[in-house]
A protein has these predicted regions:
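Transmembrane-helix bundle of Major Facilitator Superfamily
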Residues: 2-187
């Protein structure tokens, strides 16, 4: 068995898939922070609407993480991760093409529901895949690093995309990532 075959059938591939689906979740927590002037101008937003667009993601996600973890215990975390990834991808499309403040707020709320499904599913997958304590600690460190790194990278990515593309591009980048991860997860 070649090194590639070993990797493809290993728990390290599972970790790669898990952190790849988790990365957009953490990026989306901060990607819009640099987009506020562009969003305000493009959608003619009030200060209240702008606050809701930014804050709804964290508020909804924080409120749903525990219930989604309990749901994952019932239906299985792989299924929860797939459903969350599909919802996150579809909500990203809706957010990217929103034409009103309330459509964007609703899309960000749906993004948060998908994120609340993905977060406990990825953490549980890491916990249940790596049974050796030393490997599990290493894998959890990678998972946490991706989360923190994604949140730190969000404003940089948002600034770059806003400089070169329409504001909706900050959401469109999620779609191919979610599509690839869902395909890998199902097959």
């Amino acid at each position: 068995m070649s090194n590639l075959e070993k990797f493809m059938s290993s728990k390290w591939l599972i970790l790669a898939i898990v952190v790849l689906i988790y990365l957009p979740v953490s990026i989306d927590a901060t990607v819009l922070h640099v987009a506020t002037p562009t969003l305000s101008e493009s959608l003619s937003l009030s200060a209240n609407q702008l606050l809701w667009i930014i804050d709804i993601y964290s508020l909804v996600m924080a409120g749903l993480i525990l219930p989604m973890g309990a749901l994952g215990d019932r239906i299985g975390f792989k299924k929860l991760m797939i459903i969350g990834g599909i919802l996150f991808g579809l909500a990203s499309l809706a957010a990217a093409f929103s034409t009103t403040a309330w459509a964007l707020i609703g899309s960000r709320a749906l993004l948060a529901v998908g994120a609340a499904m993905i977060l406990p599913a990825t953490l549980s997958t890491v916990r249940n895949t790596f049974l050796d304590e030393k490997q599990r600690n290493f894998a959890l460190g990678i998972w946490a690093t991706v989360g923190g790194g994604g949140a730190a990278f969000g404003p940089l990515l948002g600034g770059f995309l806003l400089e070169h593309f329409h504001w909706g591009s900050v959401f469109l980048i999620n779609v191919p990532i979610m599509l690839a991860v869902i395909i890998f997860t199902i097959f």
